[in-house]
Amino acid sequence: MLDPNLLRNEPDAVAEKLARRGFKLDVDKLRALEERRKVLQVNTENLQAERNSRSKSIGQAKARGEDIEPLRLEVNKLGEELDAAKAELDTLLAEIRDIALTIPNLPADEVPVGKDENDNVEVSRWGTPREFDFEIRDHVTLGEMHSGLDFAAAVKLTGSRFVVMKGQIARMHRALSQFMLDLHTEQHGYSENYVPYLVNHDTLYGTGQLPKFAGDLFHTRPLEEEADSSNYALIPTAEVPLTNLVRDEIIDEDQLPIKMTAHTPCFRSEAGSYGRDTRGLIRMHQFDKVEMVQIVRPEDSMAALEEMTGHAEKVLQLLGLPYRKIILCTGDMGFGACKTYDLEVWVPAQNTYREISSCSNVWDFQARRMQARCRSKSDKKTRLVHTLNGSGLAVGRTLVAVMENYQQADGRIEVPEVLRPYMNGLEYIG
């Protein structure tokens, strides 16, 4: 959520920055609501002061032996007027907050202006895509050859966009997540966490999934006797529970940065993606991901974004997977991000790069919703922290990249050297 003072005092400047990301801010409506808020605020404060003054007069009149009934009736009337004024003000403030919750973050100045993914800017490339001297098989064909990917079974169990993994393919999927966690915890300084896969609505508001993206979530539906369960949804990413661990907390600045990682399944309805990537593991309703989250001082967040992106890149480099790094344009960034890097891995069967990691600086956008603050050791003042999140990496898409980039002419899949310790020294699948 943006700073209310910024919306209140600099609406035109905010509107100009939001226009860069294709969002039209209704400045006239905001101004009208703000003027109304000022009037109601003054009226409420005046009624409160008048009621306090009259209440004090009751005690004085009583001490003088005067009839206090007229004053008491007047105080009661003022109390009713005050309650009505407070209710009207609260309703208006709720309307303003509801509007604020739908406004995306401001883009950082260095983010390229653009409309969609076609305007993203490539920053760098690593590795050279392999040249094959045989016909390339895609990961679905390879998975079926080794009885490792069973989409038909998943359709029977659940429906489309799910998979059953088996045998050595399932083992490699597990090995990838373990390798990523070990790398981030042992070399990159993250602490490993195990988090709930169901979270409440306060948690989803904190990281910005609600109210705007309710349709992208899988919500629980209560049985009649279990009404309390209606307040849950499955996590779309471990960013949600990890970041909310600092909700309503005040952290000493010398405890920052806080760097957390977790391996979880992620659940997304993929609303709006009908017909896209219907074959294989690229776009699933349920997929695994190793997530990175950092909680930092405001002045450190841009450097932390570079560091975090480097941590995701290291996974790809150690796996020997060619990739490119791009900076998202204003029109393609996520709702809460001020700056985002995407890493796209080479997928041979598609002859293109596909997103495998997204690393974002969110500034204080989530922290304001969560009321997550840090305290200076010198003057004890508090301020909002900055939060960052990144994929390190999406496990299923990494599996796709490994299967396709490491395939052999006879259909076998070479196991990358860094994964062999997790697979009992296995060199090839098949």
From Swiss-Prot:
Q: Which residues are recorded as binding L-serine?
A: 237-239, 291, 391
- Reaction catalysis annotation: tRNA(Ser) + L-serine + ATP = L-seryl-tRNA(Ser) + AMP + diphosphate + H(+); tRNA(Sec) + L-serine + ATP = L-seryl-tRNA(Sec) + AMP + diphosphate + H(+)
Check the record and name the InterPro entries matching this protein: aa-tRNA-synt_IIb, aa-tRNA-synth_II, aa-tRNA-synth_II/BPL/LPL, Ser-tRNA-ligase_type_1, Ser-tRNA-synth_1_N, SerRS_1_N_sf, SerRS_core, tRNA-bd_arm
GO MF annotations, alphabetized: ATP binding; serine-tRNA ligase activity
Q: Hey, which pathway is this one from? A: Aminoacyl-tRNA biosynthesis; selenocysteinyl-tRNA(Sec) biosynthesis; L-seryl-tRNA(Sec) from L-serine and tRNA(Sec): step 1/1
Localization, per the record, is: Cytoplasm
Can you supply a Gene Ontology BP term from the record?
selenocysteine biosynthetic process
Could you tell me the EC number(s) of this protein? 6.1.1.11
Q: Name one GO cellular component term.
A: cytoplasm
* UniProt keyword annotations, A-Z: Aminoacyl-tRNA synthetase, ATP-binding, Cytoplasm, Ligase, Nucleotide-binding, Protein biosynthesis
Binding-site residues, ATP? 268-270, 355-358
- Broad EC category: ligase
Q: What is known of its domains?
A: Consists of two distinct domains, a catalytic core and a N-terminal extension that is involved in tRNA binding.
Q: Which family is annotated?
A: Belongs to the class-II aminoacyl-tRNA synthetase family. Type-1 seryl-tRNA synthetase subfamily.
Role, per record: Catalyzes the attachment of serine to tRNA(Ser). Is also able to aminoacylate tRNA(Sec) with serine, to form the misacylated tRNA L-seryl-tRNA(Sec), which will be further converted into selenocysteinyl-tRNA(Sec).
According to the record's subunit comment, the protein's assembly and interactions are:
Homodimer. The tRNA molecule binds across the dimer.
UniProt-recorded name of the protein: Serine--tRNA ligase
User: Which species expresses this protein natively?
Assistant: Salmonella typhimurium (strain LT2 / SGSC1412 / ATCC 700720)
Lineage at the top is: Bacteria, Pseudomonadati, Pseudomonadota, Gammaproteobacteria, Enterobacterales
